[in-house]
Each structure stands twice: as structure tokens, then as C-alpha cells.
């Protein structure tokens, strides 16, 4: 993950400045217009009774840069829920984990899929193929040397809070899962 961040200009800037998403970002987001990315973030956090400060600190990683990368991975998880349009059902959480695995290569996503699979009904399990396709289409890629879909750790989410949700979707190139599923049903 560090190498992917170092290979990207925005990623290098994030590693240099090491922004941390704190409770003040959530408080700021609560006052934003309903059409903004930040408002959706605040609504998600409040609905689930989450606070940015509620995340356990990264431990057992001696290298400060690698520790920050893991901190960013944890903090960006909530932003991934917002940009992908995924809630917190087991099925949606597994879709997010597949998406995160496609972006980071961390095996946690696949392990979560294996751990969550027994809790899914047959119809829900059948959806996993669609979620895999969606995550694959939203994996980091570039066109003409420019990132079409940046690795999500390289997105300056903390600077996107006041922007319109649709503007953030366009910036990231990520198709939210509900939109992907709607298009699939039309075909």
C-alpha cells in the first residue's frame, strides 16, 4: 500500500503531510448541505453511532510511515462506505471488503468474505459475483498515464467534505454500487 501511495503524486503528498480524520471533521460535516459528500459522511457516522476517535490506534508496526498507512486504511474505510453507497449489512460490508482488497491487496477483504459467507442466505451469496465484478471495475487503473480510478488511500477525502457528492464520485471515477446494480438490471 505504501508503494502505491509513493507512486502517486497525491499519495506522496498524503504520506508527507499525514492528515488524520478527527472528530472535528465529523462536526464540520454535520453543518454542510445535504448534497455534499461530508453531509453523507456525517449522516452515516451518526446513524451508526461512530466517531473517528473511536477507532483503535494502530499497534505493533514499528515503522512510523507504515503505521500511518494502516491508520489511513482504517480511517478511509468510512469514506469508502460513502463513495460506494454501501451501508452496513453483512452483504454490503462484504462488498466493501472486496472493493478494499481490489485497491490494497490486503487479504483482510478475502478473509472477511470467507468469514461472512456462512451468514449469507443463498440469494445473498449469489450477489457476491456481481459485487466482485463491481469491485473489479472500480479497482485502481489509469488511462493515458492519468489515474482513472485512484487507489482510495490516495484520495484526499478530508479535503472533499464540502464538495458535492456527485463531484467526488466524478473525481474518484468510482461507480457507487447501487448505480452499478441499477445499470445491470437494465441490461
UniProtKB/Swiss-Prot annotation:
Enzyme Commission numbers on file: 4.1.1.130
Binding site for Zn(2+): 77-78, 81, 93
Subunit record text: Component of a multi-subunit COQ enzyme complex.
GO cellular component, one term: extrinsic component of mitochondrial inner membrane
Other comment: This protein may be expected to contain an N-terminal transit peptide but none has been predicted.
Record's signal peptide: none
Protein name: Ubiquinone biosynthesis protein COQ4 homolog, mitochondrial
Mode of membrane association: Peripheral membrane protein
Swiss-Prot/TrEMBL catalytic activity: a 4-hydroxy-3-methoxy-5-(all-trans-polyprenyl)benzoate + H(+) = a 2-methoxy-6-(all-trans-polyprenyl)phenol + CO2
Pathways per UniProt: Cofactor biosynthesis; ubiquinone biosynthesis
One GO BP: ubiquinone biosynthetic process
Function, as annotated: Lyase that catalyzes the C1-decarboxylation of 4-hydroxy-3-methoxy-5-(all-trans-polyprenyl)benzoic acid into 2-methoxy-6-(all-trans-polyprenyl)phenol during ubiquinone biosynthesis.
Organism, scientific name: Leishmania infantum
Location within or outside the cell: Mitochondrion inner membrane
Family per record: Belongs to the COQ4 family.
Domain of life where this protein originates: Eukaryota
Protein's UniProt keywords contain Transmembrane: no
Required cofactor(s): Zn(2+)
UniProt cross-references to Pfam families, sorted A to Z: Coq4
Amino acid at each position: 500500500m505504501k508503494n502505491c501511495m509513493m507512486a502517486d503524486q497525491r499519495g506522496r503528498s498524503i504520506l508527507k503531510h499525514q492528515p488524520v480524520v478527527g472528530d472535528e471533521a465529523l462536526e464540520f460535516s454535520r453543518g454542510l448541505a445535504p448534497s455534499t459528500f461530508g453531509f453523507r459522511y456525517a449522516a452515516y457516522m451518526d446513524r451508526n453511532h461512530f466517531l473517528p476517535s473511536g477507532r483503535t490506534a494502530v499497534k505493533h508496526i514499528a515503522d512510523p510511515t507504515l503505521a500511518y498507512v494502516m491508520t489511513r486504511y482504517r480511517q478511509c474505510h468510512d469514506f469508502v462506505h460513502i463513495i460506494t453507497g454501501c451501508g452496513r449489512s453483512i452483504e454490503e460490508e462484504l462488498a466493501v471488503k472486496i472493493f478494499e482488497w481490489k485497491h490494497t491487496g490486503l487479504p483482510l477483504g478475502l478473509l472477511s468474505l470467507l468469514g461472512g459467507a456462512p451468514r449469507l442466505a443463498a440469494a445473498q451469496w449469489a450477489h457476491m459475483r456481481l459485487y466482485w465484478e463491481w469491485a473489479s471495475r472500480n479497482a485502481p487503473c489509469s488511462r493515458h498515464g492519468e489515474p482513472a480510478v485512484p487507489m482510495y488511500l490516495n484520495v484526499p477525502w478530508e479535503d472533499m467534505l464540502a464538495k458535492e457528492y456527485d463531484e467526488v464520485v466524478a473525481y474518484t471515477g468510482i461507480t457507487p454500487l447501487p448505480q452499478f446494480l441499477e445499470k445491470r438490471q437494465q441490461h
